Swiss-Prot record:
One GO-annotated biological process of the protein: translation
UniProt entry keywords in alphabetical sequence: Ribonucleoprotein, Ribosomal protein, RNA-binding, rRNA-binding
Name by which UniProt lists this protein: Small ribosomal subunit protein bS6
Organism in which the protein naturally occurs: Xylella fastidiosa (strain M12)
Region (Disordered): 100-143
Gene3D superfamilies xrefs: 3.30.70.60
Biased composition (Low complexity): 126-143
Amino acid sequence: MGRHYEIVLLVHPDQSEQVQAMLERYKALIENGHGKIHRLEDWGRRQLAYPIQKLVKAHYLMMNIEVEQSVLNELVDLFRFNDAILRHLAIKRSGPYTEQSFIMKSKDDKGDKPERRRRDDDESGDVGVSNDSDNDGGNAEAA
């Protein structure tokens, strides 16, 4: 059939509402080209490592697909000429990746964890109070 690819897209945060329509267009192109989508993840808005076009956040999407080279070329051209897509990356993979990505796993785990206590909840007003047995007034050298 085709080759396996992993594609990550960074979409302009103002275009988050149009993400589903964009995905439907890309899905149709892949399926019309006799390709398969093995995994599709919407990571949502995330902080960027560095500003892109003066933006500090972007909407992330990740796909694992199996397509012919010609279909991939069409997809990349669509990504390149779509102003809503800030960055795109297509990587050739050795096979289909269908299990959940690390980012989605960590998102799920966050929902399962109990809420962490804040540091200021821990300290019950004892800020600045020292224990005299631990603090000898800085005379450790003289002793």
